[in-house]
Amino acid sequence: MDLNEESAPSGVLFEEDVAEQEAKMANGGPKKGKKLEEPYRLEIVWFNVLWFVLLHAGALYGVYLIFASAKIYTTLYGFLLCELSLLSITAGVHRLWAHRAYKAKWPLRLTLMVLNLLAYQNSIYEWARDHRVHHKFSETNADPVNAKRGFFFSHVGWLLCRKHPEVRAKGGRIDLSDLERDPIVMFQKRHYYKLVPFVSFVIPTLIPMYFWGETLSNSWYVSTMFRYCLSLNLTWLVNSAAHMWGNKPYDKNINPVENLAVAIGSLGEGWHNFHHVFPWDYKTSELGNYSLNFTNAFIDLAVLLGLAYDLKTVPVSMIKTRVGRTGDGSHDVWGWGDKDLPKELADQTMIENRKTE
């Protein structure tokens, strides 16, 4: 793709954006962007390169220590922190703050904010801003994780270089007023780099040492370095693999796909073709199966506890209409007789040993 071309809007963020997007598609889709005044040049941030090389090296050593000397409690603790980190991304900054797919009372918002510090994937404010840009300008130069620039770039490379000028330009136009009205979000934004070292690195390292006598080395490399690196890569797969490998039952014209492996690893974020078509649905999928969408179960539990409310979801009629209009024909059917079974497949099906009247 041309990295010197200005990006045009390509997606929606919230339920109220649908009418605007439908009108644009009716008029022939978004207009082709104009050329940027200055040619884009990739600028590598070598500090970030060094940091991620050391992080992954430390994580690999942590894997060795899991089998060589770390206590089982340390390993289990590391995986628990990894899952909590992922939950802060999926249920918190993604579905709650970036897409406003549901609302949460302050105890849940505070909990998700603290866990977001553990995840250390940028502040809620910055993460939500970049993600809104990603949806609004998906697979264009304004997309921070543009998958058309390859797997490596969309997975981790985007963190190793300066943002494309279009990302900065379009990011400055995204409405963030709802985040700015949230005191919990703004508190974290103001104090983010003072809190992250303690919540994401110091405390996770000290707890195994204090409570079950783990060594400093095992605690640091397993429950901190390995845990952090694993949670990062499971999150990044949503940007890379879930934009490349899978089927497109809801819209065959966009890059995001349905990817079961990513869904399992990321607590339900792999149903990405659905999510990019209906980003305001709190389930991020058509499925209600908790085993393949743990975040959905967490939000539903929060509802039962009175901590979450106003959950937005897409009606079946809307899904069926979109599947029929833009899907690739891979939408699942339950078997013979399902009204979603394509007629041409039904006509070609052979029925053996047919009962005679």
Curated annotation (Swiss-Prot):
InterPro entries, sorted: Acyl-CoA_DS (IPR015876), FA_desaturase_dom (IPR005804)
List localization entries: Membrane
Q: Name one GO cellular component term.
A: endoplasmic reticulum membrane
UniProt cofactor(s): Fe(2+)
Primary residence: membrane
What CDD domains is this protein classified in? Answer: Delta9-FADS-like (cd03505)
What positions carry the motif Histidine box-2? 131-135
Q: Which domain of life is it from?
A: Eukaryota
Q: For this protein, what is the EC number? A: 1.14.19.6
Keywords, comma-separated and alphabetical: Fatty acid biosynthesis, Fatty acid metabolism, Iron, Lipid biosynthesis, Lipid metabolism, Membrane, Metal-binding, Oxidoreductase, Transmembrane, Transmembrane helix
What are the binding positions for Fe cation 2 in this chain? H134, H243, H272, H276
Q: How is this protein positioned relative to the membrane?
A: Multi-pass membrane protein
Which residues take part in binding Fe cation 1? H94, H99, H131, H135, H275
User: Which Gene Ontology BP terms does the record give?
Assistant: unsaturated fatty acid biosynthetic process
Task: Give the cofactor note.
Answer: Expected to bind 2 Fe(2+) ions per subunit.
Q: Select a single GO molecular function from the record's annotations and give it.
A: stearoyl-CoA 9-desaturase activity
Q: Motif Histidine box-3 at which residues?
A: 272-276
Any transmembrane segments, and where? 49-69, 72-92, 195-215, 223-245
Matching entries from PANTHER family are given as: ACYL-COA DESATURASE, DESATURASE 1, ISOFORM A-RELATED
What is known about what this protein does? Catalyzes the formation of a Delta12 double bond, acting on monounsaturated fatty acyl substrates like palmitoleoyl-CoA ((9Z)-hexadecenoyl-CoA) and oleoyl-CoA ((9Z)-octadecenoyl-CoA) with higher desaturation activity on (9Z)-octadecenoyl-CoA than (9Z)-hexadecenoyl-CoA. Requires preexisting cis double bond at the Delta9 position of fatty acyls to be able to insert the Delta12 double bond.
Q: Which family does it belong to?
A: Belongs to the fatty acid desaturase type 1 family.
Domains: what does the record tell us?
A: The histidine box domains may contain the active site and/or be involved in metal ion binding.
Q: What is this protein called?
A: Acyl-CoA Delta12-desaturase
State the organism of origin: Acheta domesticus (House cricket)
